Amino acid sequence: RISDIAALHPDLVILSFGTNESHNRRYNTLLHYRQMDELVRMLRDSLPNVPLLMTTPPGSYDSFRKSRRRRTYSINPRTAIAVETMRRFADDNGLAVWDMYEAVGGRQRACLNWQEAKLMRPDHVHYLPEGYVLQGELFYQALLKAYNDYVGY
């Protein structure tokens, strides 16, 4: 609930989503945009002076049943569409955005880099703990760099 977030008196709210939305085979960009808009409006109403930062999802795979016992995996093509929708929303609404999808390889390598480094769970969507640690470190480094660029370091 938004009231629970407001009760924390945050200095920054980070909105990180897109993976689950893009895993819906009926992913709808208009619906996703509207949902983000509704959430951001509620946050801004409750926390008018708190900056909001969005992060895009990393790459992930779609799973298909190849036979009764075997599944095959391919890169989820809707992730790139969700990222594009999120970037457009952030731009339209004056939100900062960290594009994790591009930071970890974009359309060509985002999934493959994590899979080859053995940082993904067998579901090919979620990370192992080490993967989440790396995600946090990448975000921290990007945030620190943006701050240093801002203050002129």
Walk through the language-model features, giving the residues of each.
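Alpha-helix N-cap/loop-to-helix boundary motif
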Residues: 28-35, 74, 78
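Short, functional N-terminal and low-complexity linear motifs
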Residues: 2-10, 49-52, 101-107
